[in-house]
Regions:
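Two-component/phosphorelay signaling modules centered on CheY-like receiver
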Residues: 20-41
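Non-catalytic signal-transmission and effector/linker regions of two-component phosphorelay proteins
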Residues: 1-24, 197, 204-209
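Cysteine-centered metal-binding/redox modules
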Residues: 121-211
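Conserved phosphotransfer microenvironments
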Residues: 54-80, 93-94, 100
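Conserved phosphotransfer cores of two-component systems
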Residues: 50-51, 78-86
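Conserved beta-strand segments of the P-loop GTPase G domain that flank and frequently precede/overlap
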Residues: 21-22, 56-61, 90-93, 113-115
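Output/docking surface of receiver
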Residues: 37-40, 93-127
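Acidic, metal-coordinating helix/loop segments flanking the phosphotransfer/catalytic sites
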Residues: 39-55, 63-65
Length: 211
């Protein structure tokens, strides 16, 4: 088990934690006894039950796909557990990933923030938590992204972004990905308006001219 400077405080009976952060990168140092970092999913669940944090935060950085799936499973458990499900669950992502956000939505995650690979600090954590609003809701972040964003695994750690409206034959990247596919502007994209295939479970999308 990974040990932290706060991991053994099972007898703590003071105020509840302001937040509990699960970040397996291990690059965070709490500044207050009411802030806590853990470096594993097991520790996170244990401390979430024991310490009753006001907010639970899980960070997804660049990592193997299997580790990402494990963190999603943690989110599922946190929102199903009767002792942790009422605490707002915030997920920090290093990039937009529609498939992952859809999994987090199903898991019951409340909020999402995109922070790239920013090094976290106590002040930054508090700023993000206090500033959470409707635009950070998982549903809102999910609906912004193009439904044709697909991901093909290259290896255990990397995926290629492709356009489902073009039969997954067009690789996406650069400005087009960030300015169109990952924003509300995807609704004006010619591939979105005239797809060669429909996204799973959705009605056919047609252009304004009915073509």
């Amino acid at each position: 088990m990974i040990q932290t400077k706060h991991a053994s405080r099972k007898g703590q009976t003071g105020k509840s934690l302001r937040y509990l952060l699960c970040d397996i990168s291990g690059r965070f140092e709490p500044k207050s006894e009411r802030e806590e970092w853990v470096g594993s999913t097991t520790q996170c669940l244990d401390r979430a039950v024991e310490a009753k944090p006001r907010t639970i935060v899980v960070r997804f950085g660049p990592m193997p796909i299997r580790e990402r799936e494990t963190l999603v499973e943690l989110c599922v458990v946190l929102k199903r557990n009767t002792r942790t499900r009422n605490a707002p669950l915030l997920v920090l992502l290093h990039e937009k990933h529609r498939g992952l956000i859809e999994d987090l939505k199903r898991a019951g995650v409340d909020f999402i923030k995109f922070i790239a690979e920013t090094r976290l600090s106590s002040s930054r954590m508090i700023e993000m938590i206090d500033g959470l609003g409707p635009d950070d809701r998982v549903d809102r972040q999910f609906e912004i992204l193009c439904p044709y964003l697909h991901y093909d695994a290259i290896d255990a750690c990397h995926e290629m972004k492709v356009c489902g409206a073009y039969l997954d034959r067009m690789v996406l990247g650069g400005k087009w990905l960030h300015k169109v596919c990952e924003t509300e502007h995807h609704s004006t994209c010619k591939y979105f308006l005239n797809p060669r295939v429909q996204p799973h479970g959705q009605e056919p999308v047609t252009s304004c001219g009915g073509g």
